[in-house]
Design a protein with these regions (language model features):
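Short, well-ordered alpha-helical scaffold segments within catalytic/effector domains
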Residues: 1-2, 125
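Conserved catalytic-core segment of NTP-binding enzymes
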Residues: 2-109
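Conserved phosphate/pyrophosphate-binding and hydrolysis machinery centered on Walker-type P-loop NTPases
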Residues: 27, 117, 121, 144
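Residue-identity detector for threonine
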Residues: 41-42, 111, 122, 146-149
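P-loop NTP-binding site
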Residues: 96, 126, 130-160
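Short leucine-rich amphipathic alpha-helical surface patches
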Residues: 105, 111-115, 132-135, 139
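C-terminal boundary of histidine-terminating zinc-finger modules
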Residues: 111-128
Length: 160
């Protein structure tokens, strides 16, 4: 894997390897060539535990540029105390935050339609674009993620 990545570096500015979450050989092969890591996790206790273990493995392999993406956060659940907040996750993992992606039904829709979501005018699409911009070194403010409004919840009830 390292040799392949070295060859690709001549052709591309960024090489992204999506590796398995576990500590098996596939993960070890992927991080062997890494100079940076983006940890993607959901704000659930078991996912945070896995992310913390992965961060430890990355640091043990001299990968210290580690950024975090919190995926599928739902502010209504955070406000009820049913989901960890952004601050809770950051306190536990102690790495830099590069993006927060709200839970968005458009993710499923775009995946099923084979359409990219990055750059679209959806909450998740905007969040993905912001992450891309931050990876490229741009200063982009974090989106404010809020729960559904009363009227959005009401509209959802009548859609059914």
């Amino acid at each position: 894997m390292s040799k392949l990545v070295e060859e690709l570096k001549d052709e591309f500015d960024y090489i992204i390897l999506d590796c398995p979450a576990g500590i098996e050989q596939g993960f070890k092969n992927a991080i062997a060539a890494a100079d940076r890591a983006l940890i993607v996790t959901t704000p659930e206790v078991s996912a945070i535990r896995d992310a913390d273990r992965i961060i430890g493995l990355l640091e043990a392999n001299d990968i210290h540029k580690i950024d975090l993406v919190i995926n599928r956060i739902r502010m209504d659940m955070v406000e009820r105390g049913d989901m960890l907040s952004k601050d809770d996750v950051l306190d536990i993992l102690a790495v830099d935050l590069i993006g927060i992606v709200p839970d968005d039904e458009n993710i499923v829709i775009s995946t099923n339609q084979g359409e990219p979501l990055v750059g679209s005018n959806t909450p998740a699409g905007k969040a993905y674009q912001n992450i891309c911009d931050r990876v490229m070194g741009k200063e982009v403010p974090f989106m404010e993620i809020t729960g559904p409004t009363f009227f959005q919840r009401l509209a959802h009830v009548f859609k059914k």
